Every structure is written in structure tokens, then in C-alpha cells.
Amino acid sequence: MSNFSVFLIALLFCSVFILSEAQIYTSKECNGSSECYSHCEGITGKRSGKCINKKCYCYR
């Protein structure tokens, strides 16, 4: 049981680290996620962006 819990904690830690690397913060202000699509396409080459707290976040 202890080996499984160590494995689970390691998996969780690695997942959080990988996900944080995939997110790119930009200083562009927005009111909705649709405003971030063209901006993120210029940065990452993909139209994957989200408006969080009136700032655009792009994803790789």
C-alpha cells in the first residue's frame, strides 16, 4: 500500500509540473476567451487560449 501511495504522489507532482509548463501568461487584457484566440495563435501557433481574470493565457 505504501508503494502505491508514493507512486500516486509522484504522478500527481509530475502532472502538475507538466501542466504548469504548458501555460503561457500574456499581459493582453480580455473580456472573453474569444478575444485571446488570435493573440495566442501568434504566440504558440495554436488558437488555444483562455481569458482568466481579464488576462489571456495561452496553451501549447
UniProtKB/Swiss-Prot annotation:
GO terms for molecular function: ion channel inhibitor activity; potassium channel regulator activity; toxin activity. Disulfide bonds join C30-C51, C36-C56, C40-C58. InterPro entries: Scorpion_toxin-like_sf (IPR036574), Scorpion_toxinS_K_inh (IPR001947). The record marks K50 as: Basic residue of the functional dyad. It comes from the Eukaryota. Expressed by the venom gland. It holds the Pfam family Toxin_2. The keyword Transport does not apply. Keywords: Disulfide bond, Ion channel impairing toxin, Neurotoxin, Potassium channel impairing toxin, Secreted, Signal, Toxin, Voltage-gated potassium channel impairing toxin. Residues 1-22 form the signal peptide. Its main location: secreted. The record marks Y59 as: Aromatic residue of the functional dyad. GO terms for cellular component: extracellular region. SUPFAM superfamilies: Scorpion toxin-like (SSF57095). It is found in: Secreted. Belongs to the short scorpion toxin superfamily. Potassium channel inhibitor family. Recombinant toxin selectively inhibits Kv1.3/KCNA3 potassium channels with an IC(50) of 91 pM. This is Potassium channel toxin ImKTx88.
